[in-house]
């Protein structure tokens, strides 16, 4: 059949279209120059990286190595991959922050909306001559000398796939696995509103390149330590549904994690259970880190902009999925978050 309108050939293109061509050309230029001169290229991603951040950085690293380059992939300590991401290809490219060259010519930063999200690697933004930012967050500060930023892209790996194509590197099964992991992570296995025709076109290319999609899905969503089941039950039993904004929230503290024998990264999926409450428009899960701080994950079903509220609290992300760090307890943290939601709603009403 013929496609028209939203399903036209342009809409079905897998290449993100909102990055200026000059930025693509600059990105390819500095990366290929580094390959030709055998200079190491540092590939970094945000603290506590997820499948999109790690998938993008590792896929780019594999592509640069295939082109003859010297990629070094890193993120802020502790450099420990979540168990759910232990299958990612290219882990031999990982290098600790303190072993990185102090004045790299090129640093590429993936899925990171602001310098502070680099944590212990924030110095790269000043130390590198060329800083390439590859990101799809609407809250991105575009802190690079070159910025491949497109909030319309369903994942950072969508942009990374385009970059690898432009570098002229064929997709191996390993590269495709890392790219696909980022794509399904940030589209919620193609459930979220960010999923586009282009996302499905990219998925088809990745499957054709050798991705074992059933294995990836099983590792990402269907494999948990037994202790997770008890912890999930505890977190759900204390969930609260409150307020005119129909917000459902719960928390996981250090005692929960220690009792279950889990790391904080391993309880990220709880937000996807909490958000299913039919009565709730917004979901929040607070998870206590080893230093006493709380990682706060937020989700919206569509009406509420949680990204802007999180940005006001020092975090960021997307309109419907975002997060921030808090040093106060869960109840006070959720109260501050709700206050920001109320302020945003009031400001929106005043502007109408």
Language-model regions: role of each:
Residues 51-57, 82, 115-119:
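Short glycine/serine/threonine-rich phosphate/pyrophosphate-binding segments
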């Amino acid at each position: 059949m013929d496609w028209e309108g939203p399903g036209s050939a342009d809409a079905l293109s897998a290449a993100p279209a909102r990055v200026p061509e000059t930025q693509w050309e600059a990105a390819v230029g500095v990366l290929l120059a580094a390959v030709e001169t055998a200079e190491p290229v540092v590939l970094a991603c945000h603290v506590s990286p997820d499948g999109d951040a790690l998938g993008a950085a590792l896929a780019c690293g594999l592509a640069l190595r295939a082109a003859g380059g010297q990629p070094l992939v890193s993120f802020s300590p502790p450099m420990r991959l979540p168990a759910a991401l232990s299958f990612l290809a290219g882990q031999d490219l990982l290098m600790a922050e303190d072993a990185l060259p102090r004045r790299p010519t090129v640093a590429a930063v993936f899925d990171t909306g602001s310098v502070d999200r680099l944590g212990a690697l924030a110095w790269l933004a000043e130390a590198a001559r060329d800083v390439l930012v590859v990101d799809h967050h609407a809250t991105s500060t575009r802190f690079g000398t070159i910025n491949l930023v497109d909030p319309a892209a369903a994942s950072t790996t969508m942009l990374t796939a385009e970059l690898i194509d432009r570098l002229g590197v064929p997709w191996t099964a390993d590269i495709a696995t890392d790219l696909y992991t980022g794509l399904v992570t940030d589209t919620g296995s193609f459930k979220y509103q960010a999923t586009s025709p282009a996302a499905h076109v990219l998925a088809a290319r990745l499957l054709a390149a050798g991705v074992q999609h059933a294995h990836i899905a099983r590792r990402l969503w269907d494999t948990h330590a037994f202790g997770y089941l008890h912890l999930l039950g505890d977190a759900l039993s204390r969930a609260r549904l409150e307020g005119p904004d129909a917000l459902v929230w719960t928390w996981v503290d250090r005692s929960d994690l220690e009792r279950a024998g889990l790391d904080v990264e391993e309880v990220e999926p709880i937000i996807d259970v909490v958000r299913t409450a039919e009565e709730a428009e917004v979901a929040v899960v607070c998870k206590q880190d080893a230093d006493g701080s709380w990682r706060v994950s937020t989700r919206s079903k569509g009406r509420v902009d949680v990204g802007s509220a999180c940005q006001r609290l020092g975090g960021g992300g997307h309109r419907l999925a975002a997060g921030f760090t808090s040093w106060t307890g869960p109840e006070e943290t959720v109260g501050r978050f709700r206050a920001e939601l109320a302020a945003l709603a009031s400001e929106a009403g005043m502007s109408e």
